[in-house]
Amino acid sequence: MGAELNILDELGTVDLPDFVLQSLDLAIASIHGPCYSTNSEITEKGSRDLNTQAYLNVMKNPYIHIIGHPDDGRFPVDYERLVRGAKETHTLLELNNSSQRPEGFRVNTEENAKVMLELCKKEGVYITTGSDAHIDIDVGGFSCIEKLIQEADFPEELIATTSYEKFSRLIRQKG
């Protein structure tokens, strides 16, 4: 069983307690606008540094396996620090198909995903793919991210979701 959690603040607080998280097989942590606020005076959903800090802090949680849609430009992030943090904590970074849809609501996702993929390739950091289907016909749809992966010449061996065995092994490395 798994869940997508809301990152609530730059401390990496999520909306489920550890005693629940430890019972899950998979936990994805994501920033979602309505749930996220920083303790800063900055009102524009935090700064690049605070958003990056939120991701880095949540990656320290041994029950969080994946960072969901970190390509959303509404929440700017330092991708060098994000990728380094993912490597250090064995956390997967999601390449999200829904983010890349032309009619999507997230901003600058293609540019951000390209930067993230390039850094992951350089640092040997694994990504995971997600359809993030908001309607049933999109479940398992990856057409937008397949294009990005090809354009980035991203190595298949760094894509966690190419086999169940690989994905399962990488998830178990966390913690």
PLM region descriptions:
Residues 125-140, 159:
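Short acidic/histidine-rich active-site segments
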Residues 92-105:
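His/Asp/Glu-enriched short active-site or ligand-binding loop at hydrolase and phosphoryl-transfer sites
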